Regions:
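Partner-binding and oligomerization surfaces adjacent to conserved cores of proteins
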Residues: 1-216
Length: 216
């Protein structure tokens, strides 16, 4: 499912800090978009006098971003915190994909970067460029680094279908119930399009704070 950013568990997700590198450039662009004959100089004065322009820009971008959908993936399947937070306390499953087998579904993947401050978005630059989408969707607080996240962006927040061939593995959590494991494997084996899927299970290491992946 591709969810709207407003539904994410982190309220800081997709936030940014607006800056105006060139008031003249912004004023010129606004004047050109208007049906009335506004002079850029008058628009520039209005911008400088508007103390809420940053807040209004943030609200406008939020509205646009929340029309779209994002699906979040990870480059790792053995991270303890990921299993604790997103897999029903290690009772859930992790799906493994070969993205090359479904390029349409996994189009425009964004590798998330992690830092202390919001990304800066220049209000005076044209909106909607890939650079700004990547900055908004691909920047998170540095404490989330363990997620090693990759995001895929779609036009609408809704469910999308992936090609079955792209699903290559299912890994069960170390606390997954035996009946759940049996049911999932049974369903996959009964579907000719999923006969290639490999099954694994995490096991708690006996000496270190880590998970080992064991083939079933």
């Amino acid at each position: 499912f591709f969810a709207a950013p407003s539904s994410f568990n982190d309220p800081f997700d997709c936030k940014f800090s607006p800056v105006i590198a060139s008031v003249k450039k912004l004023a010129s662009e606004i004047a050109q978009r208007q049906t009335l004959d506004y002079e850029p100089e008058n628009v520039e004065r209005a911008i400088l006098a508007d103390s809420a322009i940053d807040a209004n820009f943030v609200k406008a971008v939020d509205r646009v971003m929340n029309r779209h959908g994002i699906c979040c993936f990870s480059r790792k399947n053995e991270e303890i915190l990921m299993w604790s937070h997103y897999a029903d306390s290690h009772k859930g499953i992790c799906l493994g994909f070969d993205v090359s087998k479904d390029p349409d579904f996994f189009v425009f993947p964004i590798n998330v970067t992690y830092q202390d401050n919001y990304p800066k978005i220049d209000v005076s630059q044209p909106a909607g460029t890939n650079k700004y989408v990547s900055a908004l969707l691909g920047t998170k607080y540095k404490k989330w680094y363990y997620e090693q996240e990759v995001r895929v962006y779609k036009e609408h927040h809704q469910a999308y279908h992936f090609i079955p061939a792209s699903l290559v593995s299912v890994t069960f959590g170390c606390k997954a119930e035996a009946k759940i494991i049996e049911e999932v494997i049974s369903v996959a084996n009964a579907n000719i399009e999923l006969n290639h899927v490999r099954f694994y299970k995490t096991e708690m290491d006996k000496e270190a704070y880590k998970l080992n992946i064991v083939k079933l």
